Amino acid sequence: MRTKYFSLLVFIIVLASNEVIAKKHSSTPKLRRSDFPKDFIFGAATSAYQVEGAAHEDGRGPSIWDTFSEKYPEKIKDGTNGSIASDSYHLYKEDVGLLHQIGFGAYRFSISWSRILPRGNLKGGINQAGIDYYNNLINELLSKGIKPFATIFHWDTPQSLEDAYGGFFGAEIVNDFRDYADICFKNFGDRVKHWMTLNEPLTVVQQGYVAGVMAPGRCSKFTNPNCTAGNGATEPYIVGHNLILAHGEAVKVYREKYKASQKGQVGIALNAGWNLPYTESAEDRLAAARAMAFTFDYFMEPLVTGKYPVDMVNNVKDGRLPTFTAKQSKMLKGSYDFIGINYYSSSYAKDVPCSSENVTLFSDPCASVTGEREGVPIGPKAASDWLLIYPKGIRDLLLYAKYKFKDPVMYITENGRDEASTGKIDLKDSERIDYYAQHLKMVQDAISIGANVKGFFAWSLLDNFEWATGYSVRFGLVYVDFNDGRKRYPKKSAKWFRKLLSEKKRN
């Protein structure tokens, strides 16, 4: 009965979505700050490896992304790496000034694990220079009236732990992550009141252990011949399991040792697109439900029920899906104060026969996920092929989370679009303004229906190192000149946000 109920729920939301599939917007919606609740937070986001630079300075140890991009430049589209990135390590005061200038009330950043613990664990010692850097950043934010939202892990596993036991493939990572999170809470929690344990664990398992296009670059050979090792049928589920347990242990530490005195909140940032059925058939509707089970629900359901989604349990055969002990399940249930949602795009899902050969996390849902239907894209394409613009998906995803997962407090922790890097300083990004206006309008719609959304973070404050695509695309509200001292130039979209947010001050 439970499965039928939730499948029906998916059908209802999918039917609501179908009314405007691939609808083109002819104009930018007009928004006012007063369209959102008074306490609604607007901010911008970055991550450590993408913007900090200073990869080999002040005692920082290497992460798997240093190894992946520096030792194997052919794995990055333009052969670059994040060793300097946007140089926020040295220019953080300027970046905080930009946040203040735009009018943002919060900044979501991540902490570099290997900058705090160069060898990944307590045995390797704590790097005081790393502690000092984040203290300085946090204090600078607060001096400008900007709330820090800190992410503890944004994909940059210390290389030492990867060498020792395979990083998140090894069960040992759970305790090492708990210790690392403990250090963060102890040193920064008196001022940081909003924490995210993990950023996009789904991307870690999909791109790092199935597709093999992101660090540590593991996959089955039949998926990607460039992978030298890996197993897309088993490793993703083990890594995902350890990520979930690491999250649970970190939340447990905070609640037991720090919450009473620091009075902060701990959540997680999950990414997902919305999945619409390819056709109105019952089979495709079920395929859309399974696609959600293997993406958003994969990491959300254990935090609500202590169990994996039923569709995962049913579809992942041959004992490949780990199970939680009763103790672990109890720890995980309710292990969040809020949920961060990273949304960029949506897809169609089509029912396909379940595969018995060349099985991976991608084939287990028995659903073909595509951005096109009969040759027509679900929405206009940004610079990246995967980013098809479908604003209504953000509304439907928020309502899905509300109704299926006990009405959680939610923040949009990432949302944005990219443009191709041309080598010329181009600050006229009207298409980005249109993207944000359309998505914010849909967030506002979700709130009006009852979604408990408390804030919105634009991705990204700065042009940065965009993982496997390097510097070939730009997501920033602020242009960074990577050829001239990392100079910053606010784009038209930054000025659009400033105008939107200045209404509150005028009123």
UniProtKB/Swiss-Prot annotation:
Glycosylation-annotated residues: 81, 226, 358
Gene Ontology terms: biological process: carbohydrate metabolic process
EC annotation from Swiss-Prot or TrEMBL: 3.2.1.21
Catalytic activity, reaction form: Hydrolysis of terminal, non-reducing beta-D-glucosyl residues with release of beta-D-glucose
InterPro entries on file: Glyco_hydro_1, Glyco_hydro_1_N_CS, Glycoside_hydrolase_SF
Binding site for a beta-D-glucoside: 50, 154, 199-200, 344, 414, 459, 466-467, 475
Gene3D superfamilies found in the cross-reference section: Glycosidases
Keywords from the named record: Disulfide bond, Glycoprotein, Glycosidase, Hydrolase, Signal
Single GO molecular function: beta-glucosidase activity
Disulfide-linked positions: 219-227
This protein's name: Beta-glucosidase 13
Organism: Arabidopsis thaliana
Lineage: Eukaryota, Viridiplantae, Streptophyta, Embryophyta, Tracheophyta
